[in-house]
């Protein structure tokens, strides 16, 4: 299965998923974690789009654009309300649009974990980078929704240890629906060291100044 984080992909990709039998979570182009994720603090009062009326039209427009373009692809089984935009009424209204327009597919949104005011935005419990024990705590507490680990095991180089502890949950808990790896691609650029030997360089290897994040 594939999550098209964090926006719809080019149409050819869905054709290939249809042909080869991949399940798809099609994700709307909504991403605003820069408005509320600050160093050492979370500021929900800065959240966009939340329930701000001036954003509702844009939120629904992006949902419509995705659904109308992609609705005939059988590989798509879930619509996603976007990525890391906290929560709020506008995203809930987006989820309701998906259900009214297409009641054959489920709706996903990870942000309900952070903002329970509109818990019905998502048809499944979803989190990013949860620890194994945190997932088990949820699954052992009479869950009313299946758990989808929508983003996890992000790694650079050889730092990706312990993945088996997550995959083992799939056989242990019927309500655990697996997860989506971020992001199965080399995060570096091939370059050469001073001896002419090639290596994959990551951030900080180019004499660049790291950002706050």
Where are these regions (language model features)?
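Extended substrate-binding grooves/exosites of carbohydrate-active enzymes
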Residues: 1-213
């Amino acid at each position: 299965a594939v999550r098209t984080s964090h926006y719809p992909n080019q149409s050819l990709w869905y054709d290939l998923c249809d042909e080869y039998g991949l399940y798809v979570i099609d994700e709307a182009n909504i991403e605003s974690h820069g408005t509320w994720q600050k160093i050492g603090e979370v500021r929900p009062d800065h959240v966009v789009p939340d329930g701000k009326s001036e954003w509702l039209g844009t939120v629904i427009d992006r949902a419509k654009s995705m659904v109308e373009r992609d609705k005939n692809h059988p590989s798509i089984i879930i619509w996603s309300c976007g990525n890391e935009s906290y929560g709020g009424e506008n995203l809930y209204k987006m989820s309701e649009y998906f259900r009214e327009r297409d009641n054959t597919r489920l709706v996903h949104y990870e942000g309900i974990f952070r903002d329970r005011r509109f818990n019905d935005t998502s048809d499944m419990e979803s989190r990013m980078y949860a620890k194994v024990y945190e997932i088990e705590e949820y699954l052992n507490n009479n869950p009313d929704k299946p758990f989808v680990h929508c983003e996890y095991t992000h790694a650079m180089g050889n730092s990706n240890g312990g993945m088996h502890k997550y995959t083992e949950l799939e056989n242990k808990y019927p309500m655990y629906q697996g997860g989506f790896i971020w992001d199965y691609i080399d995060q570096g650029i091939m370059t050469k060291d001073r001896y002419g030997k090639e290596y994959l360089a990551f951030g900080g290897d180019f004499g660049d100044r790291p950002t706050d994040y």
